[in-house]
Amino acid sequence: MEKSPRYRDKAKNLLPSPSSCTTTPTRYVKDDMYETTFIRTDPSSFKQVVQLLTGIPKNPTHQPDPRFPPFHSIPPIKAVTNKKQSSSFRLSERRNSMKHYLNINPTHSGPPEILTPTILNFPALDLSPDTPLMSDPFYRPGSFSQSPSDSKPSFDDDQERSIKEKGFYLRPSPSTTPRDTEPRLLSLFPMTPIHSPAPSPHDH
């Protein structure tokens, strides 16, 4: 039935042409209240028909409300009052004027100033007194320099001679020990066994 020439002519008359859209397509309203439109057209004009039905009309019936600006519009910049402008201008003037009077000298041209308690106005703070020099207990007059006329041998000479001859250091010993005796070497381990004393009969 749909392939008969008579049906084709009838359907062709009902289809809207790309140049004019005066023909109203068939619309069906279902129970769910969603409008459905069925349109038949040939493949060559399908693209133009879709653009005519879904595109933006040349004379839109819906005009935007001028009271409500569009969503993507940029809000206008609020004008700044003259008072704020004058205050900011004065602030910039003060900053510019301060630059001319700013003077920084990181290096001192004169000699360095010595800070003392008097200059710092601290009368309670006094400089510590000099520590008196104490006699060096390790200092011996004849150890560093000895005149050739002095024939008395020094302690260092005796020590060096004893090292070469005896092989040990000579240290000053107490006055009770004779100076000429060699130091007695103590053994770390006993040479003879140490026996414990026999138990007495009173221990039982």
UniProtKB/Swiss-Prot annotation:
Keywords: Nucleus, Phosphoprotein. This is VQ motif-containing protein 13. InterPro entries: VQ, VQ_4/11/13/19/31/33. Transmembrane segments: none annotated. Pfam families: VQ. The gene is VQ13. The modification Phosphoserine is found at S17, S73, S128, S147, S173, S196, S200. Residues 1-26, 56-90, 133-204 are annotated as: Disordered.
